[in-house]
Amino acid sequence: MAINLKLEQIPVVYILSDSIGETGEVVAKAAASQFDSGRVDIRRVPYLSSVREVEEALQEAESAGALVVYTLVRPDLKEYLEKRAHELSLPHVDIMGPMLEGLKQITKQNPKYQPGLIRKMDEAYFSKVEAIEFAVKYDDGKEPRGLLRADLVVIGVSRTSKTPLCMYLAHKGIKAANVPLVPEATPPEELFKIPPHKVVGLTIKPSILFEIRKERLKTLGLSQTADYANMERILMELDYALGIMKKIGCAVIDVSNKAVEETAARVLEIYRKGVGR
């Protein structure tokens, strides 16, 4: 007797926005709740600023068989999206357009068509939110193209507190990305296109890194004899990382026995000096 097991297919919704994209996500989730499962795979693509970025997002959405929901206020991006969505036969829903047109009719005024104006109600808060989202999106070398949009890029070997540092900086409104340096992986080419004063390298004493990694393996329930916590391997990684930092010409900070706050204070000092360049 054959048993027919049909896996539930969760609909994919791409949220395209020239701002944060939160509005589109809220509407998509509210609409999904009206269906039996209420489940939906939300993939937010925020801060779209060019036709190229819109095209890339649409190609991803097409590959995923997704519904495109957009909250674009820039007419050029909106027109391009709608044209390409029709050409690709992509289902798409405009969240912002009808509301803008409705208000335009009753106010007899034209919209400003400027993305993110609502953020100016509390610039500091939204700057922080934007930076946090940026840090999450471009954590651990994900999406190298985002490195060129970062205020700061943090590089270093594994377990030098790159991610905690970037999140700390994000809470200061600084868009920080980080890239792990591993001998077996060639660093992204974008890393070498960034001005040196916007890159900070983190290093650490080998003995301290050895203990940190050994504890990490213990926490994960893995053998402490793994290469990850091998002193010879650690020395090789640190030497390789310092070579990359030297090639870039960036500042290097020793994080040995330093709290994230201490490292961040030094990084902020470097950042503020660089802003004036």
Curated annotation (Swiss-Prot):
GO terms for molecular function: ADP binding; ATP binding; phosphotransferase activity, phosphate group as acceptor; protein serine/threonine kinase activity. Its EC number is 2.7.11.32, 2.7.4.27. It catalyses: N(tele)-phospho-L-histidyl/L-threonyl-[pyruvate, phosphate dikinase] + ADP = N(tele)-phospho-L-histidyl/O-phospho-L-threonyl-[pyruvate, phosphate dikinase] + AMP + H(+); N(tele)-phospho-L-histidyl/O-phospho-L-threonyl-[pyruvate, phosphate dikinase] + phosphate + H(+) = N(tele)-phospho-L-histidyl/L-threonyl-[pyruvate, phosphate dikinase] + diphosphate. It comes from the Bacteria. The keyword Transferase applies. Keywords: Kinase, Nucleotide-binding, Serine/threonine-protein kinase, Transferase. The keyword Kinase applies. ADP binds at G156, V157, S158, R159, T160, S161, K162, T163. InterPro entries: Kinase-pyrophosphorylase (IPR005177), PPDK_reg (IPR026565). It is an enzyme of class 2 (transferase). Bifunctional serine/threonine kinase and phosphorylase involved in the regulation of the pyruvate, phosphate dikinase (PPDK) by catalyzing its phosphorylation/dephosphorylation. Belongs to the pyruvate, phosphate/water dikinase regulatory protein family. PDRP subfamily. This is Putative pyruvate, phosphate dikinase regulatory protein. It comes from Carboxydothermus hydrogenoformans (strain ATCC BAA-161 / DSM 6008 / Z-2901).
